[in-house]
Amino acid sequence: MNSDQFRRYLAKQGTTFEPGKGGHLLCRRDGKTSVLPQHGGAKQLGTGLMRKIKKDLGLE
């Protein structure tokens, strides 16, 4: 799954996004925060990174 697809998934779960530093977005959900890299549309995110972001946001 690339970062755009993962961002759409997170948005459906009620996550809001703010610009971060460089090519990153700050993801916020229920007072919890994580960082999502936006390093190009076709680049795949690792499963460990997606799992950590979901855990940080209380989705897992």
For each predicted feature, which ranges?
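Cytochrome P450 catalytic-core helices
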Residues: 22
